Each structure stands twice: as C-alpha cells, then as structure tokens.
C-alpha cells in the first residue's frame, strides 16, 4: 500500500505533545468476563496488563538452578520458551526436570481460548491453561515478573499473587512488509520473539507487491527468478549494478511457520491482487492485461499494472494458492484487493468483452467477481479469505470474507453492518511508517500531523464507537502495519515498531477499564531494559528531550542569550542537563523550568527513569550563533501545502540519515520565519533524490515550474514564496554531477525576518531535488 501523509506543523508543536462485564463476543475473548485488577496491579512490570491480578502475602524466589517441570508437548515447549526468555532478560538459568517449584500444566477448568492462570505462592509457581497458547502467554507473563529491573544475573523474589488472564480480542496482529524491503528469516524470527513477549498472535506477511515477489512457487519459477529482483532507481548517472531483492524458499517458510506456531503465533500470507501486480507481470507478461513486460517496479505508490481477470489470471492465482496452502496451515489467506486502479481493465477491449459476456457492469464489480471466485476456492479447502477494505466496493462480497479496514474505520463499520468479520488496521494511527516525533534524528518515514506518538497509539480503541452493539461480535481485533518503503533495514523497522507496538498490544489484550497511559509508562521502563538485552533498538522518541527556543532566533542572536524550554513527548521521568556539552548523569542539574543560556553553550539533556537509569540517549541544543542561523530539512515545510514525505538520500539506504523533507507534488520548500534580519548571506545544501513515486491519478496535482536552463534551477526568495527571486542557480547535469550540491548567495540589504523559500524548477521527468540544510552568515 502507498500512504502519503499530510503536511506537518512546526516542530515545536510536536515536542511537548503529551501529552460490569458481558459474556465475550465472537471477536472478543473471555477477558471481557474477568474482573478488573486491584489498583496495585499496575505496579507490576507487565505489558500487556493482565485482566485480573490478586496480590497475596509473601513471595517466591527464583534464581540459578530453579527447576521447571512440564508434561506434554505444549507445556514442555512453553517451559523451553520461558527458560530461554529468562536467560536473555535476567541472566538466570532455569533447569528443566520431572518436578520442580515452577510447573506448567494443562488444566481444562481454565475457560477461554488463550486464557491462563498464573499462581505464585511461597511454595512455588504454577502456570495453568486449557490450550498451548495459554501456556505460552503465561510463560511470557512469568518471564516479565522475573525481569522487573536491571539486576541482571540476580535472583528475583516474585510477589505472591494470582493472575487470571485472557485476551480482549482474537486478532492481535502485526504486518511485516517484506515486499518493498526484504527481511531475512532471522530478522523475522527476532520479530516473532518480540510479538510473543507482547502476546500478539497474528503475523501478516506482505509477500508480493509491485516491487517484489518473495515466496517460491514451484509451478512459476520466474516469480522469484525475475519477480523477486528490482533495479534500484537512480537520481542521475548509471543505474546501480546490483539488483535489490530476495525471496524465501518453501522450506524456509515452513520452518518459520513452525517457529511462530511454537510461540502461539499464526502467519497470515498475503498475495496482493489484482493491483500491486507489477512483479507478477514482469515475470509472466501473459498474466497481465496487454502482454507487455514491465520491469519490477522501483517506484513506491500506486502503479498501473493489473492481473489478467480472465481464465489465465484465475488459474494462476489458484495454482499459487495451492502451494501457499501447503506452506501456511492457518485459517486466513490475505488476497489484498487494495489500490487497484482500473485503467488497464477500462482500456482493454478483451477485458471489456469479458465483462459484457459475464454481465458485469463495472470494473469494481469485476474485482468483486474475482474475490468471490477465490473465496469459494479457499472455502472449499477449509480456509477463509481476508482482504483490504476495497473488496467491499464492487458489492456482493461473500459472507465468509473478512475485511481488513485500512481507510480509516469506515470499512469496518460497513462490513460489520453487512455481517462480515473485520480487523481494524486504520491509517494513519496504526501505520508504523508514520513518524512518531519531529525530533531531527528520526529516520526517513512518512510525516504525520500530528505525529503518531506513543500516547496516540495507546489511546486507540479497536472497537469503534460507530459499530452497533449487535455488530460488535464481528470485530476480530486489530493490527499494526510496518509498511517498508522507508523502513529499509531491521534497525529502522524496529525503531518504527517499538515501543509503539507494546502500546498497541495492551490495547488489544487488556480489558479497557484497566488501561491507563501513565501506568503503562511506568511499566514500560523495565520493558525498555528488556529490549536492550534483546538487542532491539527500540525508539526512545517518547522520552527524548526536545528543545523549544522561547522567542525568535534573531532576537536570541541580538541579545546574546537563548531561553530554552525542555520537555519530552511522554511527559514522563525527570530531565537532567549539562551546559558544557557533556553527557548528563543522575547527579546533573534537574530541569525545573526554562533555561537562559549565554550563546555559545551546548545544552545536553536526558530523561531518567524512576530507578535513575536513562530512558533515552542525550539530545543537544547548540546555542552558537552559527547553529541558530542554521536549519535542517526536518524544519522545512511545503510552501503551499501539499503532501510531504521524509525521504532518504537513496531509496534503499539502510542508515538513519540524512533525511529530506520533500513535497513530491510541488518543488518549493520554505524556512518559515527565518532570521534574515541578522544575516547577510545564505548557503543551501541540496540533495538530489530518485523521483520514484507511483502517483496514479494523483499525477494531475503535480505543479510544473518552467525551467530557464537545461536541467532547471534552484530559485531562492527571501520575501515570502511569492516574492522576487534573490538568487537563481542552474542545476548541473544529473548524469555527471554528485548527488549533494551547495549553493551560496547574498541577502539584499535591509532584509527582515520572514520566510526563505527555495523552489526547484527541474523537469518532472528527472530527479527530485530537496534541501538538506540552510545556513545563514551573520551580518556581524
């Protein structure tokens, strides 16, 4: 899917952003029938918070050599997971044995799918469940109780208690987009481990898209020989010599399915169709509409290639399904259905004749006919079709089809009203490729206004108020999606995913009455330490210190001092700072209010948790005149609105920077309120990026500037975006020039503070230009 974000607000607006049970319905579990926990339950280091916790007197100490007893394959597997998890997060070695003080048992008296009871007494610990999934969840809860702090390797006194727990929703999902940017099996296993720790149970693998086909299909070997590889787009000069891609063998995926199943996770494969099919058509042109062979796409967004809706295309999909069903034993098969622009079908005499012969009135109805065909094929084999909410648009959706609602919640509301099961996955709130803060060190992602912060994700309720009570039984749950156009490496994927996935996990597991964001933040502190033990580079964006200059930059330069307001997004922990650029410690001064700092100092600040450990890496604010007269791309905005993206220098860059705020529809960017009155000259650092965007019908919104030279110009205006140019710089030949450029010019005498606007007039058929940094030279 391609999701373009709206224009962002000023960075400072985001820095301080805080910040009687019924029987379970069809989509919900027994958790709704379990009483709320006692108030002191929130002090336990547990995410997600269990449905019910009863504290008891006493405790039981677990240390090296404590024995774990389990009988039956499921209990033994859960005990093995417990032992491995505790070894990693606490450094304690538990020992399996025929008997022991920690016991995992099957108990049919525990009611509800995935439910468990965890009992801690001075005599030992017992985990009981009626199914294997419940045993895994109980083991993960105990593992968290055994890692409450940073005392690695030390024994733990677990407080006596009884936990009765079960999930709020049956579908607690996470999507890994391995089509845009490939992820190794080892990376997926690491993600699965984290999902299990958070009691998520559905891993949605997006295995095909315009940019790549990722699963071995033996009947169609060119899907991976050709369709799994794309040539990275160029920003000028020769194309990269090495193609980008990869795929999974059937054996690898079967092994991954087993690995996930042991952790109570079902893998849901997605083959996207009839749109997002360019990799298929690149491999087998006869499966397209016109018979031409495109390249596997290097463009993000919406591309025109559709699957043939006739007998050839239908037979192909059924062949693929036959092989997928042998790999993935889960109930659901996802067949996409999103963003299929119908131009190719509309312009094909053959397709139009097919529609006429079958009495199909519209292209949307033709897509619905395909969905009905594949739904019947899957039902006959004991499976169920699930698709994105566009599968509703043509009408006649089979009752058995499940709808995943991404275009807000409207698809879920409509589908549940019509009697379909639904999964909530609305953009942008559950889209992890949206920025979680406006901190300048965030990697390239989709800007959101406001950012998709930890608190916003935590506050999302997967049961929309607009779904009528009689339809709520159709809500299976919800899913977060990590679309990977800009999530180019495991480190960036995990930065985007954690800790927001933990906030989401509590929303789909814990009963609504027990949830509280402040309590969640307290419980997140030990979870941050677990991620560090697991080598998961979770984002610290919610706790990182952001800076707001109180007043204008020009006023600070003129006065020789800066007044700074410090805050973190979550409004959590304590902020300590230094004024000499050194890293803050728990002994550093406590931030209690705005700081007035003589220019030339570097303020460095960190948020510390309740135990005195840092919750985020230090962030700095340089108060030198040079820094005050400089801005990075993150603070630039579109001159006249429009869609923005935060782009990497090259499409497949795996590092965290640089990042370029870009308006892909209008080549004009503005530094709002630039301190021009205290400057005499400017320098603009420019990056030349690949223009790799599939815009479909949105191409009509592209704004064209007439170039006065062969490759266009950078035009700088200092009196607002409609003012006269103060500098015009011809752009060099992209075929031979480097992809980072620098331009300098003088400001007219008497220039006052205002917007500094930079417009690129380069042809839309060539690369995309973006501003990396703007620097002003002080006038004195």
What are these model-predicted stretches?
Residues 28-171, 458, 492, 496, ...:
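Contiguous, structured surface segment used for ligand recognition
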Residues 69, 515-652, 690-698, 722:
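Short, compositionally stereotyped local motifs that mark structural "simplifiers"
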Residues 111-332, 373, 377, 479-480:
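Feature activates predominantly on carbohydrate-active enzymes
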């Amino acid at each position: 899917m391609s999701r373009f974000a709206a224009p962002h607000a000023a960075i400072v607006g985001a820095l301080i952003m805080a910040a009687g049970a019924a029987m379970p319905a069809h989509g919900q579990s027994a958790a709704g029938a379990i009483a709320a926990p006692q108030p002191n339950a929130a002090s336990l280091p547990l995410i997600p918070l269990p449905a019910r916790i009863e504290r008891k007197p006493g405790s039981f100490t677990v240390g090296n050599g404590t024995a774990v007893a389990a009988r039956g394959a499921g209990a033994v597997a859960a005990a093995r997971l417990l032992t491995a998890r505790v070894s990693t997060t606490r450094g304690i070695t538990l020992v399996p044995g025929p008997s022991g003080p920690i016991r995992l048992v099957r108990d049919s008296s525990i009611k509800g799918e995935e439910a468990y009871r965890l009992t801690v007494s001075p005599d030992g610990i017992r985990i009981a469940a009626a199914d294997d999934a419940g045993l895994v969840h109980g083991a993960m809860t105990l593992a968290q109780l055994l890692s409450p702090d940073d005392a690695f390797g030390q024994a733990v006194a677990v407080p006596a208690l009884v936990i009765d727990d079960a999930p709020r929703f049956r579908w607690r999902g996470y999507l890994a987009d391995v089509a845009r940017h490939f992820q190794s099996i080892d990376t997926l296993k690491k993600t699965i481990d984290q999902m299990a720790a958070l009691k998520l149970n559905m891993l949605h693998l997006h295995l095909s898209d315009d940019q790549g086909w990722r699963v071995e299909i033996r009947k169609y070997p060119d899907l991976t020989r050709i369709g799994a590889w794309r040539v990275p787009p160029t920003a000028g000069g020769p194309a990269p010599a090495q193609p980008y891609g990869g795929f999974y063998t059937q054996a690898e995926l079967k092994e991954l399915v087993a690995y996930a199943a042991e952790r109570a996770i079902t893998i849901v494969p997605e083959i996207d169709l009839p749109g997002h099919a360019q990799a298929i058509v690149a491999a087998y042109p006869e499966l397209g509409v016109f018979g031409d062979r495109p390249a596997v796409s290097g463009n993000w967004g919406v591309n025109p290639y559709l699957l043939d809706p006739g007998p050839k295309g239908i037979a192909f999909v059924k062949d693929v399904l036959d092989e997928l069903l042998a790999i993935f034993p889960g109930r659901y098969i996802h067949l996409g259905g999103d963003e299929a622009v119908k131009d190719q079908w509309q312009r094909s005499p053959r397709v139009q004749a097919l529609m006429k012969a079958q009495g199909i009135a519209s292209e949307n109805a033709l897509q619905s006919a395909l969905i009905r065909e594949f739904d019947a094929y899957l039902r006959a084999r004991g499976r169920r079709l699930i698709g994105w909410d566009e599968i509703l648009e043509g009408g006649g959706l089979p009752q058995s089809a499940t709808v995943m609602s991404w275009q807000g919640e409207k698809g879920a509301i409509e589908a549940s009203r019509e009697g379909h099961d639904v999964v909530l996955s609305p953009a942008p709130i559950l889209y992890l490729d949206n920025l979680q803060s406006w901190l300048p060190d965030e990697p390239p992602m989709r800007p959101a206004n406001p950012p998709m912060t930890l608190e916003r994700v935590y506050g999302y309720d997967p049961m929309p108020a607009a779904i009528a009570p009689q339809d709520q039984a159709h809500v299976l749950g919800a899913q977060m999606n990590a679309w990977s156009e800009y999530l180019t490496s495991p480190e960036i994927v995990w930065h985007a995913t954690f800790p927001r996935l933990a906030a989401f996990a509590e929303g789909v597991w814990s009963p609504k009455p027990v949830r509280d964001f402040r309590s969640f933040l307290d419980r997140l502190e030990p979870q941050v330490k677990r991620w560090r033990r697991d080598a998961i580079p979770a984002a610290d964006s919610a706790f990182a210190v952001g800076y707001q200059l109180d007043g204008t930059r020009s006023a600070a330069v003129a006065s020789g001092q800066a007044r700074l307001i410090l805050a973190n997004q979550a409004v959590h922990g304590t902020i300590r700072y230094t004024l000499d650029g050194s890293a803050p410690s728990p002994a550093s001064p406590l931030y209690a209010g705005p700081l007035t700092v003589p220019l030339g100092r570097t303020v460095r600040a960190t948020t510390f948790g309740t135990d005195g450990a840092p919750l985020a890496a230090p962030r700095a604010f340089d108060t030198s005149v040079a820094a005050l007269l400089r801005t990075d791309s993150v603070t630039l905005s579109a001159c006249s609105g429009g869609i923005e993206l935060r782009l990497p220098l090259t499409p497949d860059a795996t590092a965290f920077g640089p990042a370029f705020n870009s308006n892909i529809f209008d080549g004009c960017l503005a530094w709002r309120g630039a301190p021009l009155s205290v400057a005499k000259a400017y320098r603009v650092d420019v990056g030349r990026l690949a223009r790799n965007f599939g815009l479909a019908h949105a191409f009509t919104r592209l704004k064209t500037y007439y170039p006065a030279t062969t490759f266009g110009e950078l035009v700088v205006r200092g009196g607002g975006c409609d003012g006269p140019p103060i500098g015009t710089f011809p752009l060099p030949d992209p075929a031979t020039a480097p992809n980072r450029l620098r331009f300098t010019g003088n400001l007219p005498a008497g220039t006052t503070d205002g917007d500094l606007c930079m417009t690129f007039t380069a042809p839309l058929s060539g690369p995309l230009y973006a501003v990396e940094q703007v620097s002003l030279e002080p006038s004195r």
